[in-house]
């Protein structure tokens, strides 16, 4: 495969070996910039050849990339073919050591670290020309290994045929993974049998095998577990260290014992010990003790429920803590309380209640006299007959119907008569009395018409005035012209 850059400076030999430094062995860079350029070029070559190898084997993900090589201790062998231009890369072989769990010929699981062939590819235009065998032989010489010592990772049919044709490897040992090993894989390691025996795995016969899978133990571990010559090692003394931090904080005591209100009282009940001669109570003594305990429990319950009359002095409040207000009425005992009298008649306010009579002149109308709102409100309040039978407490003032009792919270009783013009009283205001003067009056210039309401006064009518005579006016409409 040809690339866009000149590869002759990178390949000083026909086959070069590349490690995780991404530089060919024996490559000497003149400067740091040259080394970085060489690394970038080798990375491009490895990525391109790895993609072509994965495509030829039918793999979805390339096995060989520059990033994977940088993060591992594997090696890549690249075969180069020079020409008059930039040169050609015709083959790649990736090898490395891996720790594998494989089955030996007897069926036992062995953990070995063996050299593996991870990727092998020769360009289609150079196949069946001996280039693959040349590359493979060079790798065997560099790694100093034999073909039967190799574990092949996911070999294709072409690779299996290549190994059988050139090295006579045909007898495979079935494995539980994707690696293929041959019979010579374990025979070549017979001289180092102690290392293999030490790492030979055995499946333990445990009842948890069906649940959690088989458990593997090595021969050395089994030998140590079954050995009788082991000396019992004294266990290390346990040193209790005091807790520190939040673990040393005091815990709150449990309050479950206080749930039962009588647990403290019952716990204090004690009975004299009446033992027989042999140190044990008789049946009659046990029954008597149970009866006494039940009686004591019943007495405690009666005390808690208020069955016995407690001492009145215990519940008498201290006189120094009693507080009595000045306007607080004097309370009478329940037996000395008089019967409540009949309820007072409901008071209805009407404008004609405000008619004032002159005692000196014989009852003439006070049209010329001034009437203040205070006097109107005083006359509008109902007067109840005095007597001790009114109400429960004699010293209580007579009840009045307030705005809260009648539901008319926005209605003023004493102002209704002053606002509403009638034949009994009139207010004429012809001149402006200045800022801050508040008077309730009809519009200026309408003093001649009596008993009629102007349109300007309609906005101050409350809902109660729509029911007929004696309506009230709401004084909260400050935007009205009257204010």
From Swiss-Prot:
Residues 370-383 have a biased composition (Low complexity). The keyword ATP-binding does not apply. Residues 1-186 form the N-acetyltransferase domain. The record marks 57 as: Crucial for catalytic activity. It catalyses: L-lysyl-[alpha-tubulin] + acetyl-CoA = N(6)-acetyl-L-lysyl-[alpha-tubulin] + CoA + H(+). One of its GO terms (molecular function) is tubulin N-acetyltransferase activity. Residues 204-231, 330-395, 437-472 are annotated as: Disordered. Residues 347-369 have a biased composition (Basic and acidic residues). GO terms for biological process: microtubule cytoskeleton organization; neuron development; regulation of microtubule cytoskeleton organization. Its EC number is 2.3.1.108. It is an enzyme of class 2 (transferase). One of its GO terms (cellular component) is microtubule. Keywords: Acyltransferase, Transferase. Acetyl-CoA binds at residues 120-133, 156-165. InterPro entries: Acyl_CoA_acyltransferase (IPR016181), Atat (IPR038746), GNAT_ATAT (IPR007965). Pfam families: Acetyltransf_16. Specifically acetylates 'Lys-40' in alpha-tubulin on the lumenal side of microtubules. Promotes microtubule destabilization and accelerates microtubule dynamics; this activity may be independent of acetylation activity. Acetylates alpha-tubulin with a slow enzymatic rate, due to a catalytic site that is not optimized for acetyl transfer. Enters the microtubule through each end and diffuses quickly throughout the lumen of microtubules. Belongs to the acetyltransferase ATAT1 family. This is Alpha-tubulin N-acetyltransferase. It comes from Anopheles gambiae. The lineage of its organism: Eukaryota, Metazoa, Ecdysozoa, Arthropoda, Hexapoda.
